[in-house]
Amino acid sequence: MADDMKVAFITCVNDEGQYEESVLYLRHLHLPKGMTAEYLPVRGAASMAAGYNAAMKSSDARYKVYLHQDTLLVNKDFVRDLLQIFEDKSVGMVGVVGCRSLPASGIWWDGMRCYGRVLHACEPESVVDSEMMEPEGAYIDVEAADGLLLATQYDIRWRDDLFGGWHFYDTSQCLEFARRGYQVVVPNQEKDFWCIHCPREKPLAPEYKEWQKNFLREYGDMLSPEV
């Protein structure tokens, strides 16, 4: 049975320095009274989806936060804010940036009506505030959210059978939640941002197009692109 008073922070790790900094931020988050936290690094994962599945199965936490090793969670009240959103049991997943309607390509950032906010620190001493539209209320439902941070209150298997690498696993998971009738939402961050993302420039994997084909083959009939 899931432990309603526990949150697990799950990260696939191949850079110990980045993960050490990320966990430093996680350990400084405020936890509501009675809540506990666990930190689950996954090393040597065959893919993001496979790593997340392994950690998901190993934890009894009701609330699981899947985040990249280069994501710094700076909102000290993140857990409180997350629990407030999850009071709505129709909300299955929370991200920080995403789009209301996926385009025909399945690539969320090419979609229309993108919502959310994240600070990007791609170079030393250079921070860009990537602020998109903000929800009018506390949060807004989206069709897809970015995998830099995805938090869940229900366990649904990540599709490691379709995505053997590091792309499309996140958009796929959003649609897996939708298939089961759950909302994926992005919170209002107008007053303050939740995350700093520190990605390093790297080329797309050669298999990217193949994973995209897998995505469209599996979920193409769910897409209704806006024009």
State each model region's role.
Residues 6-18:
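A conserved hydrophobic helix/loop-capping motif in glycosyltransferases and polysaccharide synthases
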Residues 45-59:
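Glycine-rich, basic loop-to-helix element that forms the pyrophosphate-binding segment
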Residues 16-32:
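Short, well-formed alpha-helical segments that are part of the catalytic scaffolds
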Residues 72, 77-115:
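Conserved donor NDP-sugar-binding/catalytic core segment of glycosyltransferases
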